Amino acid sequence: MILSIESSCDDSSLALTRIEDAKLIAHFKISQEKHHSSYGGVVPELASRLHAENLPLLLERIKISLNKDFSKLKAIAITNQPGLSVTLIEGLMMAKALSLSLNLPLILEDHLRGHVYSLFINEKQTCMPLSVLLVSGGHSLILEVRDYEDIKIVATSLDDSFGESFDKVSKMLDLGYPGGPIVEKLALDYAHPNEPLMFPVPLKNSPNLAFSFSGLKNAVRLEVEKNAPNLNEKIKQKIGYHFQSAAIEHLIQQTKRYFKIKRPKIFGIVGGASQNLALRKAFENLCVEFDCKLVLAPLEFCSDNAAMIGRSSLEAYQKKRFVPLEKANISPRTLLKSFE
């Protein structure tokens, strides 16, 4: 089995993945959302301290799953990029300590690659090549995935990420953090879902394949300020619905542009923001239009987790992509290549 560790942002997670058949044997996670909610976003120093508390607790649960028989482990895998440096280092220190004390090889995993492999948790076979939309609090990307070692970024955000824009809109409406499920509920509760969009769809006439949410976010801010004296629940629902609809339509328009160029046969959607049901439905329709198979990460494995890191690290294990402890380090940025 491989013991995998995830600590790139505000989720502490450990998992055990069986090498022979890619089955997830154990998965434990502690979220920090309640600790960061009053700040309207993740506070790096607080997140680091909480990882230092939570990771050892999760390791104790792993020990129980193993019946304290560490001979079942064949490798230690850790997310080392991208993410918050102060949280990545907490996971890396644990991974190095385990690797050294148990005399096990160390695997360093890219967090974005891990999200791609969330599509294949509990599955030995993958369906590569495929294209993938990754939407989260930190990223909005289209990836072309040929195999484990050949993943390229073909589109990214020029400013805010999809998930980050939901957090900021929720904060404008004084509704808390994380904003994704809060704004999604506003949209679901809105009583007039078929009216024309009140906010502009970003980059609608741009020739570039990219994402941008700053202009949409600013349009929401102006609407909130205009309604500030009477910002009741109905107005918040209307703003939430129209913001979410414009944000998803932006993703659809840009992905449709990509589809027309590349015509992928298989398209995956991953990342924490891919839990949004309206987004999933919109992409189901898009993939039907282009006769493209849609694959979705299970809802429980959309947000950051060690299970996806364990699944991706199986590929590294088979290729013997191990890293000496003295060369193991972290990076706040991904080293995946971008198309020029």
Swiss-Prot record:
Its main location: cytoplasm. One of its GO terms (biological process) is tRNA threonylcarbamoyladenosine modification. Fe cation binds at residues 111, 115, 304. One of its GO terms (molecular function) is iron ion binding. It is found in: Cytoplasm. Keywords: Acyltransferase, Cytoplasm, Iron, Metal-binding, Transferase, tRNA processing. It catalyses: L-threonylcarbamoyladenylate + adenosine(37) in tRNA = N(6)-L-threonylcarbamoyladenosine(37) in tRNA + AMP + H(+). Binds 1 Fe(2+) ion per subunit. InterPro entries: ATPase_NBD, Gcp-like_dom, KAE1/TsaD, Peptidase_M22_CS, TsaD. One of its GO terms (cellular component) is cytoplasm. Substrate binds at residues 134-138, 167, 180, 276. Its cofactor is Fe(2+). Its EC number is 2.3.1.234. PANTHER family: TRNA N6-ADENOSINE THREONYLCARBAMOYLTRANSFERASE (PTHR11735), TRNA N6-ADENOSINE THREONYLCARBAMOYLTRANSFERASE, MITOCHONDRIAL (PTHR11735:SF6). Required for the formation of a threonylcarbamoyl group on adenosine at position 37 (t(6)A37) in tRNAs that read codons beginning with adenine. Is involved in the transfer of the threonylcarbamoyl moiety of threonylcarbamoyl-AMP (TC-AMP) to the N6 group of A37, together with TsaE and TsaB. TsaD likely plays a direct catalytic role in this reaction. Belongs to the KAE1 / TsaD family. NCBIfam families: gcp_kae1, T6A_TsaD_YgjD. This is tRNA N6-adenosine threonylcarbamoyltransferase. It comes from Helicobacter pylori (strain G27). The lineage of its organism: Bacteria, Pseudomonadati, Campylobacterota, Epsilonproteobacteria, Campylobacterales. The gene is tsaD.
